[in-house]
């Protein structure tokens, strides 16, 4: 699946607008014993809460129900015909998806029918030959299922799956929900019957989605007997939260946890709407040498193929390539982005006026602009609305990743965005959006020496971030080096759970040794999702052995037990330590490989190892000698020069 993403990213280079740092803060050396005790106490608090949790009905428990308002890839949506009958593909499966809904059955036929002949003509004649327009037609058809009209309404009959509590889900759906948002630490305490999963349409209207959330909240209150709910807003869910509180206020809300939430959009979408050299990094060196290898390396662990593509892509004349990418982008803009209110909700508030004037000034867009204007109003009211909720006693905490450029770590195709050069982000959403106002220098840089924070005591140690400008600086928690895919870091998951379940954790001053305002990054997903479950399964297998069966080597038993303990310790960290997480991952992997439960990691092919620097050098030579020109451009220039001297 990841390789397919890379292929699509290469083919559509500038088109894809969708998804999801090498140093991390280590645990402080001083006060290590006291900190270890504090961490243990924090974990014990969560464990004790889980033990004390019993059946809850009629609102007679300590925890209000939590509603997850999820991200961009978390709301399965399906295509229906005009009679509300499911539309099936040739295999009898309903057409749908949680991100892009594409009917792949006719894809090859469409490409062959519309692209093959123009492509051949273009390559043979080294001229346009209608190829860019053919690409526009294919892209438009590719994304047509989720297209909206100029009023901002979905053209097709799309219905989004709706869910209740995790307890009400079937086993497969519940497992899927946990994969989308790893909430096990939360449900272990408050129960699956008190954890709900709201969904909304990716190409809908955020104002309508906020209304649906309000109705959903009333139903949850009725089911659980509570008079308030808590909201866990994840990524794109932040746009629905922004609209909701502007429309309905705080009467139904107990607590709010914003987890990498897009409360003020993403510069990625703003740059896609901006387009051209102001929106994209289309300089020759980046486009013809750096970009494609970066995408390829993410999924193939080597950029070699990317450098080869750099060399081959010059078969296409420079202007034809530019025109092709432009028309591909036109296809996305015309069928999906411009007409979709939800994507306009991802335009940061300070860029909305300029971009809406650019695209929505025509009278035919009046209805759509009324919808986008209403959401923009909610964006502008966000600070005031948050302060109002805080004054009413609603606990509102924000978790954010920082220190990365767009396209860092994962989803490297976003590195094409111009803002990648200047904006501090989690790789997907800028820090100012996920923190509701924190100030930050560009990735890898520091704030100016003469910078004056609004309030002392909220700067990062390296001087790159100031949380004092956030709406609620005391409730803003920043993980430096953390990518937007925060589910990879169990420290983030534990903190999100603690906000709701630990009554002593009120703000960044409550337990600074356990939960510092500035944390780090680590990758524990493999431990949680695969390695530890596999290790537990081995232990269970051994427990089922009879005395007559061959017994495991005592040394292996001891090593597996030690590796499990080390892995569990890594999952319970409250201060992210990448070295500890990696060491635990490596140790569990090694013993499972030894026991035959996992395959050893494949080493990179010697051919690739040899070819990579060679292809990189050839790509660089081409860049230095002919710049952004195609091969035929150079030939034409040479011929023209020769003729001029005859």
Predicted regions and their residues:
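Beta-rich interaction/scaffold domains
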Residues: 527-604
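Alpha/beta-hydrolase fold catalytic core
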Residues: 193-207, 326-417, 442-444
């Amino acid at each position: 699946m990841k390789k397919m993403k890379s292929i699509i990213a290469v083919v559509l280079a500038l088109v894809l607008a969708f998804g999801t740092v090498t140093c991390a803060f280590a645990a402080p050396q001083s006060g290590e014993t006291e900190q270890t005790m504090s961490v243990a106490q924090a974990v014990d608090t969560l464990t004790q809460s889980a033990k004390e949790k019993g059946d809850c009905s009629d609102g007679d428990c300590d925890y209000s129900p939590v509603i997850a308002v999820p991200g961009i890839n978390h709301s399965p949506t399906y295509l229906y015909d005009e009679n509300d009958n499911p539309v099936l593909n040739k295999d009898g499966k309903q057409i749908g998806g949680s991100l892009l809904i594409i009917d792949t059955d006719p894809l090859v036929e469409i490409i062959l029918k519309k692209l093959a002949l123009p492509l051949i003509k273009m390559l043979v004649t080294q001229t346009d030959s209608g190829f860019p327009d053919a690409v526009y037609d294919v892209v438009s058809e590719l994304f047509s299922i989720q297209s909206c009209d100029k009023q901002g309404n979905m053209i097709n009959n799309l219905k989004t799956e709706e869910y209740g509590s995790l307890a009400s889900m079937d086993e497969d759906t519940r497992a899927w929900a946990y994969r989308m948002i790893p909430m096990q630490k939360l449900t272990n305490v408050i129960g699956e019957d008190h954890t709900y999963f709201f969904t909304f349409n990716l190409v809908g209207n955020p104002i309508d989605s906020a209304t649906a959330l309000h109705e959903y909240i009333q139903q949850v209150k009725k089911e659980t007997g509570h008079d308030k709910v808590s909201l866990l807003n994840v990524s794109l869910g932040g746009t629905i939260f922004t609209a909701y509180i502007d429309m309905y206020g705080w009467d139904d809300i107990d607590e709010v946890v914003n987890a990498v939430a897009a409360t003020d959009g993403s510069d990625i979408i703003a740059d896609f709407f901006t387009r051209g050299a102001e929106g994209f990094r289309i300089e020759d060196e980046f486009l013809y040498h750096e970009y494609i290898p970066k995408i390829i390396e993410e999924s193939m662990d080597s950029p070699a193929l990317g450098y080869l593509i750099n060399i081959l892509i010059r078969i296409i004349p420079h202007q034809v390539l530019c025109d092709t990418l432009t028309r591909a982008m036109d296809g996305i803009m015309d069928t999906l982005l411009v007409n979709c209110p939800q994507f306009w909700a991802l335009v940061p508030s300070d860029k909305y006026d300029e971009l809406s004037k650019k695209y929505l000034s025509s009278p035919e867009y009046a209805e759509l602009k009324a919808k986008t204007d209403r959401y923009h109003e909610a964006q502008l009211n966000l600070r005031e609305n948050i302060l109002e909720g805080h004054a009413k006693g609603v606990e509102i905490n924000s978790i954010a990743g920082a220190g990365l450029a767009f396209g860092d770590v994962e989803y490297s195709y976003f590195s094409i965005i111009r803002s990648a050069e200047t904006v501090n982000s989690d790789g997907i959403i800028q820090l100012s959006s996920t923190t509701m106002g924190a100030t930050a220098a560009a990735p890898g840089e520091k704030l100016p020496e003469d910078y004056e924070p609004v309030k002392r005591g909220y700067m990062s140690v390296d001087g790159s971030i100031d949380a004092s400008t956030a709406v609620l600086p005391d409730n803003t928690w920043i993980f430096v080096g953390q990518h937007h895919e925060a589910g990879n870091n169990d420290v983030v998951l534990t903190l999100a759970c603690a906000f709701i379940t630990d009554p002593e954790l009120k703000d960044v001053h409550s337990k600074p040794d356990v939960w510092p305002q500035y944390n780090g990054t680590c990758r524990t997903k493999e431990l949680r999702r695969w390695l530890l479950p596999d290790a537990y399964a081995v232990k269970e297998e051994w427990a089922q052995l009879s005395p007559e069966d061959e017994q495991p080597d005592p040394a292996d038993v001891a090593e597996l037990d030690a590796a499990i303990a080390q892995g569990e310790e890594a999952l319970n960290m409250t201060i992210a330590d990448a070295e500890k997480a990696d060491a635990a991952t490596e140790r569990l992997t090694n013993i499972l490989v030894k026991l035959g439960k996992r395959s050893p990691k494949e080493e990179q092919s010697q051919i690739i190892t040899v070819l990579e620097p060679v292809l990189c050098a050839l790509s660089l030579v081409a860049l230095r000698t002919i710049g952004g020109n195609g091969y035929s451009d150079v030939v034409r220039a040479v011929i023209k020069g020769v003729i001029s001297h005859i």
